[in-house]
Amino acid sequence: MKACVFPGQGAQFVGMGKDLYDNNPLAKEMFEMANEILGFRITDLMFAGTDEDLRQTKVTQPAIFLHSVILAKTLGDQFQPDMTAGHSLGEFSALVAAGALSFEDGLVLVSKRAMAMQKACEATPSTMAAVLALPDATVEEICASIKDEVVVCANYNCPGQLVISGSIPGIDQACEKLLAAGAKRALKLKVGGAFHSPLMEPARTELAAAIEATTINKPSCPVYQNVSTKAETCPETIKANLIAQLTAPVRWTQSVQNMIADGATHFIELGPGAVLQGLVKKINKEMTTEGMQ
């Protein structure tokens, strides 16, 4: 069975989507529609901006969403996955690709999500760190041991690769303890703030109202959501999981394992980069993977 997966923040690069825009009339039309909806020419930043432009959360998230979703739309009838999933932001791309969300509604929600997250990051300086080669339980235990600071596991990317999220002093303390416990690496990431942690609560509250007011349809195939890790098709459950996602961890390892248990054998990553293909292979080396961008 075929699974289509969609990347999240961090996969962006200058020039992403330009080939699509230049060579496919439908893609060009959709990119121009996006420029109108957003009220600025995001295509200028995607195709010819600077890395710094693209690193701004309010630009990064809609840019990656557009690249992924427009790519899926241009495939037409060739795009017929048996199941989909997206990593963090990529979950919105997966829902649009599966017909649960309209392109316009998806873009508006992603833009609101990005703005709300950027605002929360500016209100409380915070960060994230990648942790390599420690069991999940050890990382969880160390995060829980840090008192008076927010430190949580935010991304379960593949066995032996987690991302933690929290306040800057909390992450600094956690990195020291993790290295002492034998982590191969505990490295702070260049991100705007503590995504998928309780520090995103103001953004979650803001986005919840927008998600509640948006129509979500039954998807054409199951969407494996980050929060539940299971195949979801019920619009109300999808909404609840989308709202919870901002302050909850991305359980990617478990999601991919569940997709495989349900019959997935071939994973196609749609959008910039090849991060998810690498993670799928680390979760189960028997899987075949390919990327489209």
Predicted regions and their residues:
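A short, acidic, amphipathic alpha-helical segment used as a generic capping/interface helix at domain edges
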Residues: P249-A264
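Short acidic/polar active-site loop segments enriched in Thr and Asp
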Residues: D82, E149, K184, T265-H266
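A short, flexible low-complexity segment enriched in Lys/Arg and Gly/Pro that occurs
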Residues: P62-S68, Q245-W252
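Non-catalytic positions within long, well-ordered alpha-helices that form the structural scaffold/packing
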Residues: G76, L179, I260-A261
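FabD-like malonyl-/acyl-CoA
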Residues: M1-V139, L189, H266-Q293
